[in-house]
Amino acid sequence: MSTSTATIQDQIAALQNRIKELKVSKQDASKEVEEMKALKDQLKASQKDGGPSTSNLLSLKTPKGTLDHKPEAALLRKKIFSTLEGIFLKHDASTIDTPVFELKEILAGKYGEDSKLIYDLADQGGELCSLRYDLTVPFARYVAMNGISSIRRYHIGKVYRRDQPVMTKGRMREFYQCDFDIAGPCDPMVYDSEVLRVLCEALTSLDIGEYTVKINHRKILDGIFQLAGVPAEKTRPISSAVDKLDKLPWADVKKEMTVEKGLDEAVADKIGEYVGLKGPGPEVLQKLQSDEALMGIPLAKQGLADMEILFRYLKVYNVLDKMSFDMSLARGLDYYTGIIYEAIHESSAPPSLKTIPSVPAPSSINTDAPSSKPKSSKSAATTNEDGIDESTVGVGSIAAGGRYDNLVGMFAEATGRKAEQVPCVGVSVGVERVYSIMEMRRRKGEEKVRGKETEVFVLGLGGVELEKRMEFATMLWDAGIKTSFSPKVNPKAPAQWKQADDDAIPYVAILAPKELAAGTVRIKEQVGKDAAGDAKGEEVKIEEVVAYLKQKLGRA
């Protein structure tokens, strides 16, 4: 008897979810991909033979660019959130929350070329709404709407983008961001430097390995465009093209500027003299300040003065060595007005682009060089459902931000009120990309992640009744200790040990008739430096168990 169409459809959906999971964890999915192709062929053949249509069948899978988070993944994200929240609170921040969808007009015109990635919702009751693209614009709307002049806030929440997803690199359509922003007036670069200090604290505390913070200033970049002769209406589109220099060689970026965006070739060549410059902040700053033509542009001169102050403060904060002054960093979002930055992890560059030399120094840029887009060989294991070879895509920036002084005033002005400027600066950490790095390390055995936070498993031996285990667990729960036990009335010892081992629970409380009669239990350490030498466990008086466990758990 042939497999039913519905069964085949269920198998395909299950395989699609399995392939997603394997790709996220950097495992080979070629076997599952081939199996899914065979099932799809079988499904087509079934329909040709007069089998039922699949149009009315339910496809059990998550939408493209989204994932279910299993216990281990959810717990790892919780760890990331907790680490970041602790740092934000240390810097005097309060948290807020905003709706996941905003009025469409609130988001319109804030994201430049990325506006096409906004999810628009169907009309509901006469209001046109869109899912939020980031947490920054809703924050500015919140500040303007409530007449706030000064606030330090952090916000952890989901955002949505109609991007081409690359699951293994944390590039999703639904993902978490963790934002820290300071709104309010300050002397030049005081808040900017603190936000960069917060960013470095966050990435160091997450222990994800080496990273670099690329930094630039919108006024310097706009000054370069002015010096080169870029028409005002082309400033943002050309800025967006420059921002691609971390992914494409100069020849390709120049082609986009001249062929696609209509920029004069001589103007593009002039831009090319500057955008290849990057390195330690003070060195690049000195080089730019010695450029008389650039210093003759007031906008650029002001930006360079800001950077001089910023680097001085970053040295005080002990994070200057993490910065790279990179003239190719542009950030495509329209609302930035001052410094801009992106944090790049050591694993960010995809293998195929690591072989392309970085953009050369200004004096040696060959603007006539041919395009050198890397070739990639696609395989079933690395090519996703959109035909993107995931092995050629890097993790990308793991955090980004900058100064945006006009956004709050823009909202206030749009309501007809007096446009009060509330200067703002902030940073956003991309949780999914940080998670993908930590998940890679976990798969390599560098990071251990559990699916539960249970601290003690109550194990009964020798026919100890369920009520005794319940009573003991209740005592631990009342003391705030995370505890579990077998739900069976008469569980077998091997099954109980297996449950404790499978969940990697660090301590087991062994309840046995002899010890209970003496008013004691045995506490055995399962995970940790003392576990190997703790074969039988330590006998502890029942009235002292809570204090003993809290001391072991570091909560004494």
Where are the predicted features?
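Auxiliary tRNA-acceptor-end handling modules of aminoacyl-tRNA synthetases
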Residues: 2-3, 9-76, 122, 231, ...
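Alpha-helix boundary/N-cap detector
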Residues: 3-10, 31-34, 233, 248, ...
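Surface-exposed polar/charged interaction patches
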Residues: 22-25, 42-49, 227, 244-248, ...
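Proline- and acidic/polar-enriched loop/turn elements at helix boundaries
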Residues: 34, 100-101, 215, 237, ...
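TRNA-binding/sensing appendages of the translation machinery
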Residues: 43-137, 145, 173, 188, ...
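Positively charged, Gly/Ser-enriched RNA/tRNA-binding surfaces
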Residues: 76-91, 102-105, 135-147, 151, ...
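Acidic, His- and aromatic-enriched active-site or binding-groove loops in soluble protein domains
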Residues: 116-126, 230-258, 345-349
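Glycine-rich, mobile lid/loop segments that gate access to catalytic sites or pores
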Residues: 213-224, 229
